[in-house]
């Protein structure tokens, strides 16, 4: 049988839903719906969030809520899920209230226009009826938002079964395993009883079986848990409170014991002296009077509350007693004048001339403000409802229609909350009572008001005159117009315009830096090749010794050596290598210009070109011999030949150069270590990635080899199957023909047998 779930909610189902939500929470709707036979999880969830939830407001709609609802419906049309939390109601309540406001105003307008009258008006559904929007034969679509139906006296069997099952499941606080737990408990009880019966029978037979007792300082690992630490009962440590309770209990026990001993001593003394009276039965612990204790606690609470109250500090009065007396006298004078005029025959004429000073106008609004209908105007709710009806009746202006003329006023579009217009009522105006004279019917302050009005008019005239003077100082407008033919810019004009443009500071700075860098490059190019290549320069300059050691019979060679020594000394002094200090003096060789350097190069090329090939070969041979002779000496350091005449100079030079070389070697070693560490830091990630890629490639290669083997096997199988397929097909066809023949013979036999019968 198919069971259709749904329908109106009953009181029993609501109560089951409340209890289920309190136990299972607001997320397990499938489990909750299993308790309700006729409801789905979606319906249970909707019922909770639309009706049963305690946070849902079911009171009458206030004016502020109506204004907020209409304002949000105007800003967010048909977005009721978004509007509901802002208004503080459910989405269904907001929609129903919105429709009700529109229906009420529409019915009111129809009644005013006379569209509903006579029998039609009496037959029409009431406005407040929630079912008036339903047609005949239609069902309520939102049954979850309606009150629950009362339970029937005679429930159906399925309802009774549902109720009993829900009661049993909700009463089960031990979870789904309650039956198994009860069964295990019964089995444990049976096992214990059987064990006792067994011990009793063995004891009757003379066999005593004692329970195992643990020896001292030993542990039974089968019965206890080693190194067990029991967790705390709660979130906080209450050991100190337990100790304090134990101490208090022990002191109370001691007092009871002492009181009992004293009573026994007094009883024995009374018996000794013969005037013993039977003591009254008293309790061991004196019971306090409950009412007196409650009264005492109440007084303590009141005293504590009184101590919490602060002293009332009122501000000082703004109106003195003299001013109050003057106001009272003015009121009495007006009352006396009115009483005197009322006694005369023509009291009406004089009464109209006198003001009434008994009723004081207040700056605060009344408790019951005047509604818009009493003032002859419509309130914001009615205006918004009428505007919404007009929007619903007409097409939107986005479809090409004219804009709908809406009624001005309402809640506006300034924000999420509706905006209220300023109240024009004199009773609610905050400045309706001007300071000391709330009413001036007798024109007591007419002179002061007139003087103030004249002063303000005079100030306005002065301000207007000053404004006119300032406007007169403005230059007169020129209305000379001249039409010119547009002229397109030529290339020359573009170049002129570009030249006129001011150069940017960043471009100028970059241009200056480039110019300085170019000058430095040209200056470095004019220096020697040792400086350009940043080669090592000597740290000690001794031009005279160098000249003596390199003197030659050829005057041309001597000139060249002299220039070379001067250039080496100048480079060592003017451009020291690194941060080393150079010992010795030398004359600075001036830098040559670019033209002079180019001229020298041309002369060298010309001179070298004039040399014959044999001379050039001889020159190269002599150069190599000289170079090898200088660098293959027995001395530890090259270049010490110049110190052969002086042993002390040789020893000092060796020591100096040795220390410098060792220091440079140590420095270079540190730099190399730093560079190696830096290179390792930079390359480590790449090295790890390389290893990872190598492993990945190896795995991929193995997988590729495996797939190739599989492909070869499958191709071989394919070829074998393709070759064997015709044979198998032929065998199957032969088998089929045999089966057909056998079946034909069987049919003939069957026909023959049936024909004979």
UniProtKB/Swiss-Prot annotation:
Biased composition range(s): Basic and acidic residues: 271-307
Example of a GO biological process term: mRNA splicing, via spliceosome
Stored SUPFAM superfamilies: Homeodomain-like (SSF46689)
PROSITE patterns reported in the protein's UniProt record: HTH_MYB (PS51294)
Superkingdom: Eukaryota
Record bears the keyword Repeat: yes
Keywords tagged on the record: DNA-binding, mRNA processing, mRNA splicing, Nucleus, Repeat, Spliceosome
Chief place of localization: nucleus
Any Pfam family the entry gives: Myb_DNA-bind_6
Location of this chain's protein in the cell: Nucleus
Span list, region Disordered: 271-319
MF annotations from Gene Ontology: DNA binding
Record-linked Gene3D superfamilies: Homeodomain-like
DNA-binding region: 29-52, 80-102
Residues covered by the HTH myb-type domain: 1-56, 57-106
GO cellular component: cytosol; nucleolar peripheral inclusion body; nucleus; post-mRNA release spliceosomal complex; Prp19 complex; spliceosomal complex
Record function comment: Involved in mRNA splicing and cell cycle control.
PANTHER family cross-referenced by the UniProt entry: CELL DIVISION CYCLE 5-LIKE PROTEIN
Family recorded in the similarity comment: Belongs to the CEF1 family.
Binding partners and assembly: Belongs to the 40S cdc5-associated complex (or cwf complex), a spliceosome sub-complex reminiscent of a late-stage spliceosome composed of the U2, U5 and U6 snRNAs and at least brr2, cdc5, cwf2/prp3, cwf3/syf1, cwf4/syf3, cwf5/ecm2, spp42/cwf6, cwf7/spf27, cwf8, cwf9, cwf10, cwf11, cwf12, prp45/cwf13, cwf14, cwf15, cwf16, cwf17, cwf18, cwf19, cwf20, cwf21, cwf22, cwf23, cwf24, cwf25, cwf26, cyp7/cwf27, cwf28, cwf29/ist3, lea1, msl1, prp5/cwf1, prp10, prp12/sap130, prp17, prp22, sap61, sap62, sap114, sap145, slu7, smb1, smd1, smd3, smf1, smg1 and syf2. Interacts with sde2.
Protein name: Pre-mRNA-splicing factor cdc5
Species whose genome carries this gene: Schizosaccharomyces pombe (strain 972 / ATCC 24843)
Species classification: Eukaryota, Fungi, Dikarya, Ascomycota, Taphrinomycotina
Gene that this sequence comes from: cdc5
